[in-house]
Amino acid sequence: MSQKKNLKLIIEYDGTNFLGWQVQKSGRTVQGEIEFALRKIFNTNKISLIASGRTDSGVHAKAQHANIKLMTDMDTKQIQKAINGNIGKDVYVKICEFVNENFHARFNAKIREYRYFITDKYSPLNRNKEWCYLYDLDKELLKKCSDLIIGEHNFSRFCKASSDVKSKICHIYESEWNFNHGSGNYVIKANRYLQHMVRYLVGTMLEVSRGRYSITQFKSLLNDKNDDIMVFRAPANGLFL
């Protein structure tokens, strides 16, 4: 007899042709694609996949965690194979396992990590996985900016203007730029994120690097004290969860 089990999935996807993670009224989403496969496999409409976080349109993931409770007597290898056989080639369930019934992908995720990739050399093969940024990088200024981000701040100036989230306070545990010849990547670890937050941070730090804003101005943005500066949003293609 089938038993209700809590299934954990670790999912990798190329977000280029998705309108983000969350199901929408129209358009292709990662959640929608996987839930469609699950409905087909388990012959039920009672499917509700919970993710550790929601990625925006065009954003990728190397290890998106999700869970769902299902009535099943299938083993995890069978489920993994069935899901991957019913979804597109730009999304893949890497790990599939049964976990404690109390596990919740969103609430159990205390720290979430994002990486943003930039390069100074355009590549047709990598154009959807990194931002080709052709301005010179001031590495010292970028390091100073990233150091300022660590800690607890009000990120009201670094999120989508229409965001209706009550609290815009986030705690940043790690914020660091890494460089290798003409390439770079920015790593951030936080307890939570606001919509477009990482992309606004990356874009605005690069504006400081170009000399368009000062460190003092950037710092004032972190304290939600400067409405005169236009924050710049980096494109989605360089961002990975």
Task: Describe the function of each predicted region.
Residues 1-241:
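Structured-RNA-binding interfaces characteristic of tRNA pseudouridine synthases
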